[in-house]
Amino acid sequence: MSRRLDLDALDLSTKTIPAQAAIGTYMSSTIIKAPASSVWQAVNDTDSWPIWNTFCPGATIREQPDTTKSRSGRLQLGTKMTLHLNWNPRGTKPKQMDVGLVVTEFDPPIKGRETPGRIAWATDSSAKGFPSWLLYAERVTELHESEEWDGEECQSVTQVLSWESQRGPLAYVVRWFMGKNFKMCLRVQADDMTSFVEGQKL
C-alpha cells in the first residue's frame, strides 16, 4: 500500500537545527519506482555522481573513518568530503562552488522496517570555507519505501525527501539572493536521481 508523505505536515528539523530555528530551509521530494536499497546506492556512492548528479557532479573524499576504505567513494558515518557544486545545472556555463562537509547520520534502509533510511551531512568546521558560526548547513535525505499496485503487480517505490536547513548570518544572504535557485537545483537533483535509478532497472 502506498504511504506517500504529506509534504505540508512534515517536521523538517535536522539533528542540530530545529525546524523553527532554521533561517532557511530548502526541500525537494520525488517518487522513484525502485526499492530504497537502489536509491541508497545512488546517494551513497559518490563515484556515480558524475554520471547523473548535475547539481553536485563530484565529491572529493578528504577523510574516511574506516582506513580500509580510504580510497572508496562510498560514504559512511564520519566521512569528510568536499562537494563540487554546480549552481547552474541546466545551463551551458557551470557556476562552481566547493563546500566542505562531514557525514553526521548514516542509517541505511532495511526492507520492512517502519523508519526510513536516512543520511545527513553538515558543515565541516575543519574544512576550508566560511566559519560555521557565519554559515552552518545540514542536509538530510530520507528514503521512504512502500508498495504500489501498477495494475498488474505490486512494486516497490521510494519517496525521497531531501532538505537542507541553514543558520548563521550568511543564511539570510542565501535565502534572499539564492533561495529560489537553491530550490531549483534541488528539484533538478531529484529529477536526475529519479531518471538514473529507474534507468538502472532497464
Swiss-Prot record:
InterPro entries on file: COQ10_START, START-like_dom_sf
Pfam families hit by this protein: Polyketide_cyc
Knocked-out gene: effects: Does not affect the production of oxopyrrolidines A and B.
Reported function: Part of the gene cluster that mediates the biosynthesis of oxopyrrolidines, polyketide-amino acid hybrid compounds with feature structures of tetramic acid. Does not seem to play a role in oxopyrrolidines A and B biosynthesis.
Protein name according to UniProt: Oxopyrrolidines biosynthesis cluster protein O
Source species: Penicillium oxalicum (strain 114-2 / CGMCC 5302) (Penicillium decumbens)
Lineage of the species this protein comes from: Eukaryota, Fungi, Dikarya, Ascomycota, Pezizomycotina
Gene this chain is encoded by: opdO
